[in-house]
From Swiss-Prot:
Single GO term (MF): serine-type endopeptidase inhibitor activity
Domain commentary: The reactive center loop (RCL) extends out from the body of the protein and directs binding to the target protease. The protease cleaves the serpin at the reactive site within the RCL, establishing a covalent linkage between the carboxyl group of the serpin reactive site and the serine hydroxyl of the protease. The resulting inactive serpin-protease complex is highly stable.
Family label: Belongs to the serpin family.
Keyword Cytoplasm: no
Keyword Ribosomal protein: no
Name assigned to this protein: Serpin-Z6B
Length: 398
C-alpha cells in the first residue's frame, strides 16, 4: 500500500505545486484496520484489498497487531536505542455507544482506548481533545491534525492512529563535515544550495541497473537475541537526475514492499564520494482522494457504506454511518545525529454524512537529485514512514 499511496499523494501534490512528500503507511494501515473491524460487504472487501490483507478481518487484525506489538516503547534514545511510540484512540458521541466487539477488536490489536464525547453539543471541544491526544502521542511534532470545522454535530465517531519515531544513527555524521552543495531539482527546475552530510566510512550500498540503494541503520538497544539494527532509513536513488518517477513505477510494478525488501543492501562497502542532504519535511491534509484512487470507495459513500458493526443502534431516525474524510499528518527531520519523525491518521465517521550484484568498490553515492526514502523495521518489513525528497531546502507542507 505504501507505494500505491505515495503515487496518488504525489499526483495531488503536483496539482498544488508541491513536490516533497512524507507520510506513514503504518499509521494509515492501523487506522484503516480498525475501520475494517466494523465493516461488512463491499466496504470490507475494498478495505481488505487495499490493505493487501487476508480474506478475513480477524486475520488482518492479528497480523497488524503483531507488527504494532513488535515496536519497542519507552525512552529508547536514552539507552542508545530507538524511541518508538504508537497510539490508537476512538472517540464516539455519548448518545451512541461503540459495539463491544468493535471496541475489543481495536483494543486487542492496537491497545486502543475508547472515549465518549459530545459531538452534538460541543464539537469544538471534542476536536480540541483529539488534537491534544495526537500532540501528546507525537511529542508535539503534530499539534493539530483536525482543523477547524472538521468535526461537526453530524460526527458520530473519530478513529485516530499516531506514531512517533526518534533514533540516532549507528554511525553518526560529523557536523563539521556538512557543507553546502548543489541539489538538482526535477524537470530542469534549476539547482538549490543544500546542506549535505558527508562521510568516508563504509556504507550499506547496493548498485542495480538504473539505481542505487543506501541503507543507514539506526542504533538499537543491546540484546542477547537481537544483535542487528532493527530500524533503518533506506534511500532509493535513481541514476538519472529526473528518474524518480520512473523508479517509483518500477518499484510498484515489482511488488512495492517486496521490491524494497529484495533490494535492501546486506553488507557495507567502501565508498568513494558520499553525500546525502539533510532534510525536514511535513504533510498535513486529507488522503480521502488518494484512498479512493487505490480502491477504497464504498466506505466514503453515504448510500453504499456498510459500517453496521461499529456503533450500537441509536434512535430510529439515526442515519447509517459512513466515512466523511481521512486526515493524515506527518513530519520528519533527518540530520547528522539521526531521525525524528511522527505521523497521525484520523478517520471521521458521520451519519450519512531480487539479490544485487556485488557493488563496485569503492562506490559513489551522491544524493544530489530527487530520491525516495523509507523508514523500515527490518525483521517484519513494516514501512513506518515513506516519502520522497524533491527539494531538501523546502520543508513543504500540503
Amino acid at each position: 500500500m505504501a507505494l500505491r499511496l505515495a503515487e496518488r499523494l504525489s499526483l495531488e501534490e503536483d496539482s498544488v505545486g508541491g513536490g516533497n512528500l512524507v507520510f506513514s503507511p503504518l499509521s494509515i494501515y492501523s487506522a484503516l484496520t480498525v475501520v475494517t473491524a466494523g465493516a461488512r460487504g463491499t466496504t470490507l472487501a475494498e478495505l481488505l484489498a487495499a490493505l493487501g490483507a487476508p480474506s478475513s478481518r480477524d486475520a488482518l487484525a492479528e497480523d497488524a497487531g503483531e507488527i504494532v506489538r513488535a515496536l519497542p516503547g519507552g525512552s529508547g534514545t536514552a539507552t542508545g536505542g530507538p524511541r518508538v511510540a504508537h497510539a490508537c484512540g476512538l472517540w464516539h458521541d455519548r448518545r451512541r455507544n461503540v459495539k463491544p466487539a468493535f471496541r475489543d477488536a481495536a483494543a486487542a490489536s492496537f491497545q486502543a482506548t475508547t472515549r465518549a464525547v459530545d459531538f452534538l453539543a460541543n464539537p469544538e471541544e471534542a476536536r480540541n481533545e483529539i488534537n491534544s491526544w495526537v500532540a501528546a502521542a507525537t511529542e508535539n511534532l503534530i499539534d493539530t491534525i483536525l482543523p477547524p470545522g472538521s468535526v461537526s454535530t453530524d460526527t458520530r465517531l473519530v478513529v485516530a492512529s499516531a506514531i512517533y519515531f526518534n533514533a540516532t544513527w549507528q554511525t553518526p555524521f560529523r557536523k563539521q563535515d556538512t557543507k553546502k552543495d548543489k541539489f538538482h531539482i526535477l524537470g530542469g527546475g534549476g539547482d538549490v544550495d543544500a546542506d549535505f552530510m558527508r562521510s568516508g566510512d563504509d556504507q550499506y550500498v547496493a548498485a542495480y541497473d538504473g539505481f542505487k540503494v543506501l541503507k543507514m541503520p539506526y542504533n538499537t538497544r543491546a540484546s542477547r537475541t537481537h544483535t542487528q539494527p532493527q530500524y533503518s532509513l533506506c534511500v532509493f536513488l535513481p541514476d538519472k537526475r529526473n528518474g524518480l518517477w520512473t523508479l517509483a513505477d518500477r518499484m510498484e510494478a515489482g511488488g512495492g514492499e517486496v521490491f524494497l525488501r529484495e533490494h535492501m543492501p546486506e553488507k557495507r562497502v567502501k565508498v568513494g564520494e558520499f553525500r546525502i542532504p539533510r532534510f525536514k519535511l511535513s504533510f498535513d491534509g486529507s488522503i480521502k482522494t488518494a484512498l479512493q484512487g487505490v480502491g477504497v470507495r464504498a466506505v466514503f459513500d453515504p448510500a453504499a457504506a456498510d459500517l453496521s458493526d461499529v456503533l450500537e443502534e441509536g434512535n430510529s431516525g439515526d442515519p447509517p454511518l459512513f466515512v466523511s474524510d481521512v486526515l493524515h499528518g506527518a513530519a520528519i527531520e533527518v540530520n547528522e545525529e539521526g531521525t525524528e519523525v511522527a505521523a497521525a491518521t484520523v478517520v471521521i465517521m458521520k451519519g450519512r454524512a531480487r539479490r544485487p550484484s556485488p557493488a563496485p568498490a569503492p562506490v559513489d553515492f551522491v544524493a544530489d537529485h530527487p530520491f525516495a526514502f523509507f523508514v523500515v523495521e527490518e525483521s517484519s518489513g513494516a514501512v513506518l514512514f515513506a516519502g520522497h525528497v524533491v527539494d531538501p531546502t523546502n520543508p513543504s507542507q500540503l
